């Protein structure tokens, strides 16, 4: 997979220390890149969705006290279309992991590969704005 989104993703992560991320996020990023290069499209989608969860929670001090104030910005800094892209990513991940009947891209049809490649590209594109929020200036 050598799409534009993967190239943008690789440029964003190319400089060590450019992103303010923890070890869990770094491991998932490395795995996502390996999966994308190997054309493991389902894995790219799942890794991208996992990255969203980790990026919104890693490093935050979790306080389960109901009186505690919420910490971090989560996804609130994203534009509406960026948030919708993450919602579509989550939906695709759920269709992969939780069987609910036949699903596009998982039918055994010849066109599945092209569909999944496009979905993997969209998954990477969806997480770019969230990663950009982690840039250190």
What would you call each of these model-derived segments?
Residues 29-60:
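Short, hydrophobic, well-ordered secondary-structure elements
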Residues 80-137:
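Charge-enriched, short contiguous segments at helix-coil
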Residues 21, 37-41, 82-85, 109:
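Residue-level recognition of alpha-helical structural elements
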Residues 1-40:
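Charged alpha-helical initiation segments
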Residues 59-91:
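Short, charged amphipathic alpha-helical segments flanked by flexible coils
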Residues 24, 40-47, 85, 92, ...:
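Residue-level detector of well-ordered alpha-helical segments, enriched
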Residues 58-62, 96-99:
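A short secondary-structure junction motif
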């Amino acid at each position: 997979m050598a799409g534009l989104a993967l190239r943008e993703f690789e440029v964003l992560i190319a400089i060590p220390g450019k992103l303010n991320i923890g070890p869990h996020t770094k491991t998932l990023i490395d795995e996502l890149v390996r999966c994308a290069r190997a054309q493991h499209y389902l894995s790219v989608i799942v890794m991208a969705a996992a990255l969203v969860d980790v990026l919104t929670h890693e490093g935050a001090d979790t306080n389960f006290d109901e009186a505690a104030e919420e910490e971090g910005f989560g996804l609130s800094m994203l534009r509406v279309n960026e948030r919708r892209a993450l919602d579509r990513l989550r939906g695709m991940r759920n269709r992969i992991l939780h069987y609910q009947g036949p699903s596009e891209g998982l039918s055994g049809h010849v066109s599945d590969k092209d569909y999944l490649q496009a979905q993997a590209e969209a998954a990477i594109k969806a997480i770019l704005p969230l990663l950009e929020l982690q840039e250190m200036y």
